[in-house]
């Protein structure tokens, strides 16, 4: 297992945890003083009350919780969001309300999940032509239905 150092901004904050042995993500919870209401079609920045330090060559991806998306039409706006290895600020989640109803976030609500992922850095080399492929420039549905 890869060690993730976590700083809690309040002693009562519940640390993210894997819910099952097969889980790839850990749930993140809202850490807020007052309820936040997200109007239909609008966004809100939700603090989690934690900051992390992860090893070099890793990132934490912030993704929606499938239950919130399926049942309430609530998602993470910039999914997947990235927490870089050198970022030390509080993790905040940009939620978007895609439903037609108000959505209320309370402190302790599970609002997103975080997944630790290895990253590979690329080295760019400018060229005049790219190698040919069968697909070529085909995109946006060009490989079939």
Model-derived features with residue positions:
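DUTPase catalytic domain/fold
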Residues: 1-145
């Amino acid at each position: 297992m890869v060690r993730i150092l976590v700083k809690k901004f309040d002693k009562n904050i519940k640390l993210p945890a894997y819910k099952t042995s097969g889980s790839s993500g850990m749930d993140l919870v809202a850490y807020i003083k007052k309820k936040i209401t997200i109007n239909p079609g609008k966004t809100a920045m939700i603090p989690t009350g934690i900051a992390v330090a992860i090893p070099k060559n890793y990132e934490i991806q912030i993704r929606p919780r499938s239950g919130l998306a399926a049942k309430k039409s609530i998602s993470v706006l910039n999914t997947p969001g990235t927490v870089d290895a050198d970022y030390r600020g509080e993790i905040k989640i940009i939620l978007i309300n895609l439903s037609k109803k108000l959505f209320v976030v309370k402190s302790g609500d599970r609002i997103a999940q975080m997944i630790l992922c290895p990253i590979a850095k690329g080295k760019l080399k400018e060229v005049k032509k790219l190698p040919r492929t069968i697909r070529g420039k085909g995109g946006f549905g060009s490989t079939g239905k």
